Curated annotation (Swiss-Prot):
Residues 65-86, 234-238, 410-449 are cytoplasmic. Glycans are attached at residues 128, 282, 353. Homotetramer; disulfide-linked. Homodimer. Keywords: Cell membrane, Chloride, Chloride channel, Disulfide bond, Glycoprotein, Ion channel, Ion transport, Membrane, Transmembrane, Transmembrane helix, Transport. May act as a calcium-independent, swelling-dependent volume-regulated anion channel (VRAC-swell) which plays a pivotal role in the process of regulatory volume decrease (RVD) in the brain through the efflux of anions like chloride and organic osmolytes like glutamate. InterPro entries: Tweety. It is a multi-pass membrane protein. This is Protein tweety homolog 1-A.
Length: 449
């Protein structure tokens, strides 16, 4: 389980994490998230292939039903045919209604997934802003200290060259300034790493845009098929129902395929979300070679993990305090004797004030709470909203696949019974919900009221 403060794996994550992981040899595989390992990839592909098995079963059922329909249709009497037409029509309507309900679920799931991924990208950009601010603040402060050492402190050494006690104080100040610069330079832990959170956020956002668009198109396609199927049944347009039957068959393949992809994604994501800290720490350390203590500090952010920057920050703070004392002593004792040194001492004092302001800002940025909050927000977006959205998309694909399986079985029987619209409809079943005669009587009855 995750030890991150503020994040806890959800119950559906724990349930999916317990799904058996089996490779192609039907051997149990460890359910720890390891997408780079072939056995784990086999386990996810095996789960995705379950949808392929369901597709094969649905195709067999469709074939058996259509064969029976073709062979047994001629043996039915007229009353049985009319009754069956009514049942088939209602079956098609029920399948379309279920599909429409699935489409609504799909739109919600797609939106939830998009919200979760957006939260991840937003957190990555915040993380990049914090890390960039640390690097810029450190580099600016180190550059400022170096410039003071090269200019003002060097000039002060020349001015106090004949006074040993003042020269010793200036050289001590110089060593402490150089020590502060060195300590701060070592704090910039993310500088020069190959992992850029902003680039990663752009890549994730790019992939998510196409994923979101693909699902929107699939949902709209399903909705259009449902509407045109109802139109064809209501108006008894044979060619339209035939076209919708063919299109429904291809969408049936897409539905089972998307279900397999969503099933593998949901299980893989649950494996990650059940214990994200270990995977994130190992991968980040492998790519960036950052000290594991630093990564553990920001990932855990609790009292049990010491601040890895504490010693450097404490040393720098003491050095800045000593520099303050020495500068005050020089202003009090040296300036009356060396008036030309006042300008350089004021410049060093201004540098010291700026450095202390940057130092306090740097301490706030280095605190684990900011980066840890971004990390937890990313986990919540991915493992709460993202996981919930994928599960709703999985339900949509399942309902869509079942609905189109029923439609492909039922629509051929419906279009075969359609009569030419110019013929007499007296022999039609009065209980048929799309009987044109019944609709005509209803319109006449309304006009007479």
């Amino acid at each position: 389980m995750s030890t991150s403060h503020g994040y806890r794996a959800s119950w559906w994550t724990n349930i999916l994490h317990q799904v058996p992981h089996t490779n192609f040899q039907f051997e149990v595989v460890d359910n720890q998230f390891a997408p780079q390992e072939w056995p784990y990839q086999q386990a996810l592909l095996f789960l995705a292939s379950i949808a392929g098995l369901c597709l094969a079963i649905s195709l067999i059922l469709i074939c058996v039903y259509l064969i029976r329909f073709c062979c047994c249709a001629s043996q039915e009497d007229d009353d049985s045919k009319n009754h069956r037409v009514c049942c088939v029509t209602w079956s098609c309507v029920a399948a379309v209604i279920i599909c429409c309900a699935g489409i609504g679920i799909g739109f919600y799931g797609n939106s939830e997934t998009n919200d979760g991924v957006y939260q991840v990208t937003y957190s990555l950009m915040n993380t990049n802003h914090t890390l960039t601010s640390i690097n810029l603040l450190v580099s600016d402060t180190v550059e400022l200290l170096s410039s003071v050492v090269k200019s003002d402190l060097t000039q002060l050494e020349e001015i106090f060259s004949k006074r040993t006690e003042f020269l010793v104080m200036i050289r001590n100040t110089r060593r402490q300034v150089e020590s502060v610069a060195q300590q701060l330079a070592e704090i910039s832990f993310w500088k020069g790493t190959e992992l850029n959170p902003n680039v990663l956020a752009e890549q994730v956002n790019f992939i998510e845009d196409y994923r979101w668009l693909a699902y929107i198109l699939l949902l709209l396609l399903d909705l259009i098929i449902c509407l045109f199927t109802l139109l064809g049944l209501a108006k008894r347009i044979k060619w339209l129902v035939i076209v919708m039957t063919v299109v429904s068959f291809f969408v049936l393949l897409l539905s089972w395929g998307s279900m397999g992809l969503e099933m593998a994604t949901a299980v893989g994501l649950s494996d990650f979300c059940s214990n994200p800290d270990g995977y994130v720490m190992n991968q980040t350390q492998m790519i960036t070679n950052i000290n594991p203590d630093i990564l553990q500090y920001y990932i855990s952010c609790n009292q049990d993990v010491a601040n890895p920057f504490r010693q450097r920050l404490t040393t720098s703070q003491r050095a800045l305090s000593n520099i303050h004392s020495q500068l005050h002593g020089l202003e009090r004792e040296a300036v009356p004797q060396f008036p030309t040194a006042e300008k350089n001492l004021l410049a060093v004092q201004g540098m010291l004030n700026t450095t202390e302001g940057n130092f306090h800002h740097l301490v706030a940025l280095l605190n684990c709470r900011g980066l840890h909050k971004d990390y937890v927000d990313a986990l919540k977006g991915l493992c709460y909203d993202g996981m919930e959205g994928i599960l709703f998309l999985l339900l949509f694909s399942f309902l869509s696949a079942l609905s189109f399986t029923a439609a492909v079985c039922s629509l051929p029987r419906a279009w075969k019974r359609f009569q030419n619209r110019d013929l007499d409809y007296d022999d039609m079943d009065e209980d048929d919900p799309f009987n044109p005669q019944e609709s005509k009587r209803f319109v006449q009855w309304q006009s007479s009221i």
